[in-house]
Swiss-Prot record:
It is found in: Magnetosome membrane. Keywords: Biomineralization, Magnetosome, Membrane, Transmembrane, Transmembrane helix. It is a single-pass membrane protein. Signal peptide: none annotated. Its main location: membrane. It comes from the Bacteria. This is Magnetosome protein MamS. The keyword Nucleotide-binding does not apply. Belongs to the magnetosome MamS family. Residues 43-180 are lumenal. The chain crosses the membrane at residues 22-42.
Amino acid sequence: MDFRPDQVVARIRGAVEGALTAQSVLGIGGALVLILVVIALLPDRFTRGEGKTATAVSSGAAQALPAALPGLSPFTPAKPLQFSGRVTQVASIGNDVGWGQVHVWIDNGTGALQEISVAPQSYLNQIGCPSFDGARISGIGFLFDAGRPNAELYAKSVLVGGRTCKLRDDEGLALWMTVQ
């Protein structure tokens, strides 16, 4: 049998000639493209059958509880702690890597210096916070790493020179991240 592409194409044309018009071929092609677009826009949970919500049932009751969201870990919020003392040292840490943060060390009368992470100098200037050099300060802060010896306290607010400087919210998140 002699196999030549032009003869195969001619046979196919002869078989479909008259059965399909150019408009019907375009219509079928357009419908297929539309179906593919609709399938691509459907959420994965419909196309993969993953739309079921996971629940957990406690052993003592038949009440369904929602499953924990992926990526979240339970934690115990840090309790606010009060601090006060005279500033013995002021340093800006992290300027060389782009996130400069003012830290102060205070003598709180216990014989050991306490390190307090304050805020970037640019934020302190923006809110009009006075200089810490040699000042007597007091405030509220969070100790996030209580297990580490000499862990720094993250100041929520500091009273310095008669002015209260608000630095973090109740969860310890930096207020300078939201200032325009």
